[in-house]
Amino acid sequence: MAINAQEISALIKKQIEDFQPNFDVTETGIVTYIGDGIARARGLDNAMSGELLEFSNGAYGMAQNLESNDVGIIILGDFSEIREGDVVKRTGKIMEVPVGEAMIGRVVNPLGQPVDGLGEIETTATRPVETPAPGVMQRKSVFEPLQTGLKAIDALVPIGRGQRELIIGDRQTGKTSVAIDAILNQKGQDMICIYVAIGQKESTVRTQVETLRKYGALDYTIVVTASASQPSPLLFIAPYAGVAMAEEFMYNGKHVLIVYDDLSKQAVAYRELSLLLRRPPGREAYPGDVFYLHSRLLERSAKLSDALGGGSITALPFIETQAGDISAYIATNVISITDGQIFLQENLFNSGIRPAIDAGSSVSRVGGAAQIKAMKRVAGTLRLDLASYRELEAFTQFGSDLDAATQAKLNRGRRTVEVLKQPLHKPLPVEKQVVILYALTHGFLDDVPVNDILAFEEALYDYFDAHYDNLFETIRTTKDLPEEAELDAAIQAFKDQSQFK
């Protein structure tokens, strides 16, 4: 059989034309150092800052330092299987976390993977962990109240939707309890809550999750946890993962409350990473951009304009102080970023005043605009009364000869302190807070013994629920006080039929 040269060349040409190249082009590098949650790799000359990188064993990292010779990478997750000489490749993507309704009621790690043993999370939506905060024109002033259910906060340092309110205090002063109570009080308020636990013991996180489940709050809450036993990159990334999940709801017109418990531990984790990446240390060995670490996180909490749907993220960041020192580096940084702070004091906590809020050092810079009219009217002078009581109390240590006016002020002050106490996990609806504060400021408690105040309060609520529910309804719907004569008569009627005459 004769071989036709033309046929052969036509066949070869056809083969060449039909050839489909079947290979992927990826930029890869080689790991030159590994340890303590950090890797260095050569050969990734075009890597982007914050880009997700994949190691040969399937672990992921994030490019942090882009240097002339190599790239500093923080490893997200377990780094025990990574070795020097391993291949690391670019993905061309920045780090994203899963978001959406499917996350609600779940406990996840900072990568959005479930850790509660309840199976996979069915969601395809994702958001980048680092995104720019809304601009000035995309925002709106804070004007809607976020009721925490705690009298001391809602009366003295009110919080509005879209506000950042720092909770600062020593360890074991009830910071977490304040936030958990605020989450419990959002039941039925069409609010989604996110609790970010940073560097907590796993047993502690478990306790908080069980508390939320017990009171039915897990139905509208996402828990993001980076426990103390996890590598520092996960502690560093956890708050950003939490706020990315919150932004998905905010940009869909919903309201979110996010709690960061606590940012001191995130700053320590970031300091560890920065020192391992050989970034120059500054004050207290923190890197120079530790302010930006927190400012870019907290600026993402906002009240959006109506054009963008009017959603909001309200942030409650925590800072743990040492011996009540609120002038420490990280504490002053976060105080200057937030719209106010609630300072919890150890000596108040130990003397049985809980929540242990120091009214003198606590302030809400924008919450006043969000406070309902009824609360404004009953709590207007409360802060001044408390401050003058504390001053007089210190003064009376030296002598007992007091005129009647001073004695009356002291008596009112003691009752104010007692009224602002509240049992754990029992947040109060705002209408009940208004009634008891009205009774306090209008002298109805002046003849009630201090030790009976809490019993008086419970009995008053029960009596109003049974006989004067219309007054509660008026406060709920109009956000203002009912007729003073009507309220006075109702409280007096309760006193007349009770043992607190």
Swiss-Prot record:
Keywords of the record: ATP synthesis, ATP-binding, Cell membrane, CF(1), Hydrogen ion transport, Ion transport, Membrane, Nucleotide-binding, Translocase, Transport
- The catalytic activity of this protein is classed by the Enzyme Commission as 7.1.2.2
Q: For this UniProt entry, what is the primary localization, expressed as one broad class?
A: membrane
Q: Where is this site: Required for activity?
A: 362
The main enzyme category here is translocase
Its UniProt entry gives the catalysed reaction(s) as:
ATP + H2O + 4 H(+)(in) = ADP + phosphate + 5 H(+)(out)
Q: Which SUPFAM superfamilies match?
A: C-terminal domain of alpha and beta subunits of F1 ATP synthase (SSF47917), N-terminal domain of alpha and beta subunits of F1 ATP synthase (SSF50615), P-loop containing nucleoside triphosphate hydrolases (SSF52540)
Gene3D superfamilies attached here?
2.40.30.20, ATP synthase alpha/beta chain, C-terminal domain (1.20.150.20), P-loop containing nucleotide triphosphate hydrolases (3.40.50.300)
| A GO CC term assigned to this protein in UniProt | plasma membrane
Known InterPro entries for this protein? ATP_synth_asu-like_sf (IPR023366), ATP_synth_asu_C (IPR000793), ATP_synth_asu_C_sf (IPR038376), ATP_synth_F1_a_nt-bd_dom (IPR033732), ATP_synth_F1_asu (IPR005294), ATPase_F1/V1/A1_a/bsu_N (IPR004100), ATPase_F1/V1/A1_a/bsu_N_sf (IPR036121), ATPase_F1/V1/A1_a/bsu_nucl-bd (IPR000194)
Question: What's the domain of life for this entry?
Answer: Bacteria
Q: How does it sit in the membrane?
A: Peripheral membrane protein
Cellular location(s) = Cell membrane
Which residue windows are coiled coil?
A: none
Q: Which PANTHER family match?
A: ATP SYNTHASE SUBUNIT ALPHA, MITOCHONDRIAL (PTHR48082:SF2)
Q: What does this protein do?
A: Produces ATP from ADP in the presence of a proton gradient across the membrane. The alpha chain is a regulatory subunit.
Spell out the subunit comment: F-type ATPases have 2 components, CF(1) - the catalytic core - and CF(0) - the membrane proton channel. CF(1) has five subunits: alpha(3), beta(3), gamma(1), delta(1), epsilon(1). CF(0) has three main subunits: a(1), b(2) and c(9-12). The alpha and beta chains form an alternating ring which encloses part of the gamma chain. CF(1) is attached to CF(0) by a central stalk formed by the gamma and epsilon chains, while a peripheral stalk is formed by the delta and b chains.
What is the similarity comment for this entry? Belongs to the ATPase alpha/beta chains family.
Q: What is this protein called?
A: ATP synthase subunit alpha
- The encoding gene: atpA
